[in-house]
Amino acid sequence: MAGLDDLVTALALRAGEPTGHHARRWSSATAATRWSRPRPILRQHLPYEAAVFVHYSNLDPAMRRAVEDGFAQASVAVCVASSTLELGIDIGSIDDVALVGPPPTLTSFLQRIGRGGRRTGLTSVLCLPRSPLEQARFAALLALAQSPSPSLPIPLAPSPPPFRPSVLVQQTFSLLKQSPSGAVRLADLRRIAPAEVEDRALRQILDHLTALGFLRRGGLGEWRPAQRLHELADRHEIYSNIGADPLALQVVDAFSGRVLAQTGQMRSKGETFLLGGRLLEVVWRDRYRLGVQPAAGQPAEETLRFVTAPFAVPLDISQAVAGQMGLAPGQMALVHDETGALLFHFWGDLYGALLAAMLQAELDEEDSIIARLNEHCLRLPAGLLSLPPWDEALAHQQVRRLMPQIQPYLELGRFHSLLPPDLAYLAALAQVDLARFAQLYRAATVLIPPAGLRLRLLSLRG
């Protein structure tokens, strides 16, 4: 399927088409850090001169702005971006968008492709799937983009979604830095918190942040910033609840101290890695930072990996893929093979993981394992005619057991880890929406697909 080579070919072919009075400008949305050298390869193989930029959220804001300004000013340019393309980055007008692999949600898809064609009023997007699974998801996204109300066996998710209390952690930090007195009181949080958040929960948040060393008790009924909060503020990490873990390591220029990026990986002195297409070497490190300098004449040991939450394909996208296959809402397909059976549930990553856990708990044999193949499919040790009866207690038990695994799917906010554990769990549970899962479970039916559908389903095994 498609990849970086296909993107280069597409850029070369598209360059020959008329573009009016403007030079052609591309943005490629992809997991840029997964490629060891996206910028050098594009520069080497493009059959025309073009400025090539790399943009992702873990870059320091100053470096991101430099990339945005450079792309906006260049007459012919390619910007290889991660999901930052959907966040409204200021990179000027874009003629075309290429997607190497599909984004997880319809909103992400529309935001990414919507960045292109604003000068002409015509959206031009090149979808490059790397597997039959991605091809099916692209087809589902394109279908939903034309008719964004999918047929689901249950009502759509509630709107607005449940409140994420991690916002209150970020707001506490921000209030403290804006406070003329340098202190925050419970009443300050009460003014910005939703009515459903009780005063007791607000006090728990403040006390927990104190125990973690971000706050300290001041005068009667007030809290002041402590050392760990000062360190976060110095790194400008307190002003948004969106993005990477605020406690991640900083990658800085070894001599100027300029912040370059964030990562969750500690490195040893002398190690080399690629960052934004540049080869860098670690020359010193301390508790929170890695000091780096440019390194020449040697291969990179690997590309720097960043702290990013894994994306989850949601229920509506997975159900749209089922619709593309010809299944009705709520239908599952069971395909027998030599090792057991494949259950194509089309429930997405989150509910697929919970379904696997529920079915696993129903098995008596300890050596019978239910495996998740992807967002649409489970491998079962044997077939089944229908799902076991719904068990509310078992569902709660499995959610609690799975929570460390599924929590990154829930987009709980970058300060979620600083909430009191009980409050953090309840916030995550609200995002799971067990009542909705129960509706989906009870409405499910299992069918044995005919031969043609069976072959199409087997292409989605991954």
Question: Where are each of the predicted segments found?
Answer:
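Minor-groove-contacting beta-hairpin "wing" of winged helix-turn-helix DNA-binding domains
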Residues: 221-227, 290-291
